[in-house]
Each structure stands twice: as structure tokens, then as C-alpha cells.
């Protein structure tokens, strides 16, 4: 009887779960997933009411991946119940290069989209939309895109993996404190209460990556993005139910159609907020809070910006309503917004699977195919190069043309 290869995955978010999903499909692995909390992890970036599912990318690789992922969202039993095909409205005036390149890629790949240049043209596509375009703004609608219930999607995959024999270890037993190493080989991980050994280790630790990895050479930066929710009346819910996802890359503001339980969620995809901390290792890194905050008070600038954009899209009355809930959602940023699927340069068997940079969730159904493909060096060289561990000193977010809004700020 052939012995299974033992694998430890640190991190029970989308990157870790998708890697486990791919390894489970391949067979021959005994998998343990460690996290300080059971999934869906309450403060993970992959856990929330909704996430945008789109193929709209100025990067042709991600555009193609998005089209493939959308097909899985529509048809795969693990995901299709969580997908809402609302369509997406892509608006811009200043950041037109990203918008226009996205539309060009979609067209080349056979995805139809409807362009609009005036509010009247927009409302022919979405009759219930009450927002106005600013002077010079234009955009397009992609009716194949939409959104997904992120939390329920995670639950669906966790249940599947558990039934397939994957072990989930959480609490102090799953809280990783350090690596167990022997020269340039990682033998296992030490947790708060014990240790786990394995032949292969995958670090999919999201916004905690820089604080957990030794000598990470500042490849990753945790940035917090402001998120808020407002409760709609039953009449408003019915009125706005057929609205699309709205995405404005001039401001970074985006907003979803109402959730089935009647909430509007909106946020900013920007340069974010850092939370620099002195770590026991001597490093200074941006790190999310150890204990998740329930409805944290948003920075005043962020609240005003969210309300200003909410007023533009959903009207004055709704924009002045008290927030039902708020959140700081922590991204794992890389300098160029590329994922990192590669071995740590100091350890030959430590595979790092992270760097979502605010756009990883949509690929949940197919992400493991690419991350594990990189782990086994099965992908074509351009993809291996795209997602390699980059040693160049690049300025964070300087190469991510999807970001907008104020410069990065430190949380006070």
C-alpha cells in the first residue's frame, strides 16, 4: 500500500482551502489545515456577505481565469448556489486605461458588454439605477459578472473537504507560532499547545503572512480597507433588487445589490490603512488585530468618502442612514498585485500561497489548480514567472492600476 504524502496547510481562507481542494482531487495526500479559528474565519478577508465575481481585468491572464472561474460559479455544485448573476457596471473617467483594457480583453475573449456614455444610456441597461454619472464619466456593463455569498461558499468547501478526510485544527492547537526547521528544510510547525510535522508545508496565511514568515524581505503588506453596511426597508429592497454590482476605479468605491436579507454592502478598493506593530521577532510589520473587532469605528475620512459615494449611487436619504455594521477588511498586498505561488527562498519545502491583493476570492473554484500547479512546477513558464517570489524592491501598489482613492495611511 502506497503511503500518502503528509501536508500541512497553515491558513483556512480561500487560498488554503483551494489548495486543499486541488490536492484532494488529485488524491494521495493526508491534509491538515491549521488556523487559529475554525473556518469560516471571522476576520479573514474571504468571509463576508458577498464578494465581486468578475472577469473584468486589464491583465489578459486574470481575464481568462475570471471567465473560467465564472463558469465554475454557475455550474459547480460546490459554488453555484452561492452565485448571483446580477451583472456589473464598470465606471471611470480618469482611470480609463484600466477600464478600456478590461473591455478590450473581454471582447477578444468573446464576452459581450454594453457600453454607455450618459446616465440615460446607463438606465436603459439598469432601469432601477438612480445614480447619476459625473461629467466625463463613462463605462460598460458586463452581464456575465455578479457576486457570491463568500461565507456560505467557504462553508460549502469546508464541508466537502471534511467529508473527504481533511483535518481542520483550530484554537490554540491550530495557532501557529513558529516553524520547526533543520537547516533549509521545514520539518513542521509549532503551535500554542504543540507541534505538527509534515513532508510538505503550505503557508496560506493571508494578511498575517509578513508577521509569521521569517525573513520575508517585506514581500507582503497587510492593508485594511473600509467596509460598511446599511439596512434597507422592504420597499427599497424590492426597488433595488435588480441593480448590478457598481465598480468605480476612479474612487475605488464599489457597492453590491441588496443581499437576500436586505442589506447594502459597500466598500473602497484603495491603498488602504496599515497597522504597523513591533513583533517579537524584531520586525516591524503591518498586522491585523489579534482579536477581530466587531463593527470598528472607521477612520473619519473613510466614512465620509463612503457616504459621499453612496449618495452618488443610491441617493441622499440612504447615504445619511446609520451604518448597520462596519469592518476593516485586510488585504495581503504584493507590490504588483500579483499572487505569490512559490517556495520561500530560504526553505526548499515551504510553499507560500498568498498575495490576494484584494482580488483573489473570485477565483476560489479554480485557484488551487494554479497554486498547486506552481508547487509542482507543472504550469507554463510565463505563469511560474508571474507568480514567483519576487526579490526586486518594488513600491507597494505602484503597479496595481486597479487601486484608487487616498494614499495609504496608518491607522491611529
UniProtKB/Swiss-Prot annotation:
Q: How does it assemble?
A: Dimer.
Q: Per the UniProt record, which EC number(s) apply here?
A: 1.5.3.7
Q: Where in the cell is it found?
A: Secreted; Cytoplasm; Nucleus
Q: Which GO terms describe its molecular function?
A: flavin adenine dinucleotide binding; L-pipecolate oxidase activity; proline dehydrogenase activity; sarcosine oxidase activity
Cofactor(s) needed:
FAD
UniProt-recorded name of the protein? L-pipecolate oxidase
| The protein's role, per its UniProt record | Oxidizes L-pipecolate and L-proline (6,7% of the activity for L-pipecolate).
Q: Which organism is it from?
A: Schizosaccharomyces pombe (strain 972 / ATCC 24843)
Amino acid at each position: 500500500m502506497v503511503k500518502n504524502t503528509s501536508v500541512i496547510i497553515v491558513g483556512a481562507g480561500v487560498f488554503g482551502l483551494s489548495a486543499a481542494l486541488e490536492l484532494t482531487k488529485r488524491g494521495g495526500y493526508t491534509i491538515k489545515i491549521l488556523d487559529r479559528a475554525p473556518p469560516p474565519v471571522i476576520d479573514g478577508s474571504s468571509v463576508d456577505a458577498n464578494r465581486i465575481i468578475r472577469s473584468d481585468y486589464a491583465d489578459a491572464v486574470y481575464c481568462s481565469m475570471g471567465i473560467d472561474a465564472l463558469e465554475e460559479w454557475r455550474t459547480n455544485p460546490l459554488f453555484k448556489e452561492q452565485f448571483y448573476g446580477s451583472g456589473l457596471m464598470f465606471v471611470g473617467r480618469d482611470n480609463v486605461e484600466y477600464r478600456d483594457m478590461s473591455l478590450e480583453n473581454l471582447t477578444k475573449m468573446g464576452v459581450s458588454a454594453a457600453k454607455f456614455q450618459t446616465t440615460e444610456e446607463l438606465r436603459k441597461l439598469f432601469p432601477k439605477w438612480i445614480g447619476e454619472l459625473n461629467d466625463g464619466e463613462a463605462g460598460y456593463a458586463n452581464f456575465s459578472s455578479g457576486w457570491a455569498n463568500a461565507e456560505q461558499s467557504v462553508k460549502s468547501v469546508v464541508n466537502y473537504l471534511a467529508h473527504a478526510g481533511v483535518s481542520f485544527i483550530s484554537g490554540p492547537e491550530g495557532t501557529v507560532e513558529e516553524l520547526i526547521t533543520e537547516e533549509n528544510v521545514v520539518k513542521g510547525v509549532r503551535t500554542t499547545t504543540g507541534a505538527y510535522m509534515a513532508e510538505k508545508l503550505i503557508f496560506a496565511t493571508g494578511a498575517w503572512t509578513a508577521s509569521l514568515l521569517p525573513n520575508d524581505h517585506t514581500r507582503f503588506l497587510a492593508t485594511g480597507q473600509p467596509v460598511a453596511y446599511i439596512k434597507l426597508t422592504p420597499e427599497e429592497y424590492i426597488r433595488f433588487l435588480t441593480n448590478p454590482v457598481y465598480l468605480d476605479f476612479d474612487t475605488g468605491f464599489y457597492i453590491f445589490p441588496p443581499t437576500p436579507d436586505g442589506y447594502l454592502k459597500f466598500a473602497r478598493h484603495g491603498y488602504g490603512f496599515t497597522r504597523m506593530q513591533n513583533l517579537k521577532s524584531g520586525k516591524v510589520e503591518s498586522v491585523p488585530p489579534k482579536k477581530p473587532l466587531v463593527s470598528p469605528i472607521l477612520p473619519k475620512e473613510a466614512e465620509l468618502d463612503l457616504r459621499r459615494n453612496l449618495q452618488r449611487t443610491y441617493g441622499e436619504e440612504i447615504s445619511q442612514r446609520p451604518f448597520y455594521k462596519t469592518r476593516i477588511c485586510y488585504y495581503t498586498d504584493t507590490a504588483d498585485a500579483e499572487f505569490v505561488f512559490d517556495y520561500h527562498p530560504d526553505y526548499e519545502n515551504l510553499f507560500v500561497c498568498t498575495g490576494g491583493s484584494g482580488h483573489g476570492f473570485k477565483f476560489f473554484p479554480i485557484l488551487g489548480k494554479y497554486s498547486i500547479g506552481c508547487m509542482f512546477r507543472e504550469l507554463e513558464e510565463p505563469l511560474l514567472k508571474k507568480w514567483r517570489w519576487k526579490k526586486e524592491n518594488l513600491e507597494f501598489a505602484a503597479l496595481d492600476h486597479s487601486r484608487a482613492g487616498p494614499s495609504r495611511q496608518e491607522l491611529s
